Regions:
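Short conserved AdoMet
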Residues: 42, 64, 124, 138
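A short glycine-rich, Lys/Arg-flanked "PGG" loop and its adjoining helix->strand segment in the class I
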Residues: 127-142
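A short acidic, Gly/Pro-enriched loop at the edge of an enzyme's catalytic core
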Residues: 101-114
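Class I SAM-dependent methyltransferase SAM/SAH-binding core
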Residues: 49, 55-102
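A short SAM/SAH-binding and catalytic strip from SAM-dependent methyltransferases
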Residues: 113-125
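Ligand-binding pocket scaffold of soluble enzyme catalytic domains
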Residues: 24, 33, 61, 85, ...
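Short N-terminal helix/helix-N-cap motif within the alpha/beta-hydrolase-1
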Residues: 77, 123-128
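Conserved class I S-adenosyl-L-methionine
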Residues: 1-43
Length: 143
């Protein structure tokens, strides 16, 4: 199932990246999400994992706010686009191709926050994902 989902997003990666580029160039959209992340995350720098990062919109904003971000996506082509966007927007974000359900590369209690915008519906086993996400959060961490 993971492979089918990955293939679909790989096929649609160009269109999805075009949409994200429009969002990143729209000051109102960037301002809205910047305010929302400030409100949700607070002023202290956090270790954040973005699951299903796509071309990197939320990771770019979180990194601009001073957070230490790792972004993962299941599509190799999307990961390439996210890396390009990080360079284009001068952000230091670790980006990896990784299964967002099993998180095979993540250690227990590693993150303060897990972000996921528009990706939960694509998970092939959401219950398993949420259990795993909880395991990689530090005590008191938030999804």
């Amino acid at each position: 199932m993971f492979e089918k989902i990955e293939n679909k997003w790989t096929e649609d990666s160009g269109d999805y990246d075009d949409m994200i580029q429009k969002q990143l160039s729209n000051k109102r959209t960037v301002s809205y999400w910047t305010k929302e992340l400030k409100r949700l995350l607070g002023p202290e720098p956090l270790r954040i994992l973005e699951v299903g990062c796509g071309p990197g919109f939320m990771s770019i904003i979180a990194a601009r706010l001073g957070h230490d971000v790792k972004a993962i996506d299941g599509s190799s082509r999307i990961v390439e686009k996210a890396r390009r966007n990080m360079r284009q927007y001068h952000q230091q974000v670790e980006i990896c191709e990784e299964d967002g359900v099993t998180l095979p590369l993540e250690q227990e209690q590693s993150y303060d926050v897990i972000l996921s915008r528009d990706a939960v519906w694509t998970l092939y086993d959401p219950e398993k994902a949420f259990r795993r996400w909880k395991a990689v959060l530090k005590p008191g961490g938030r999804i």
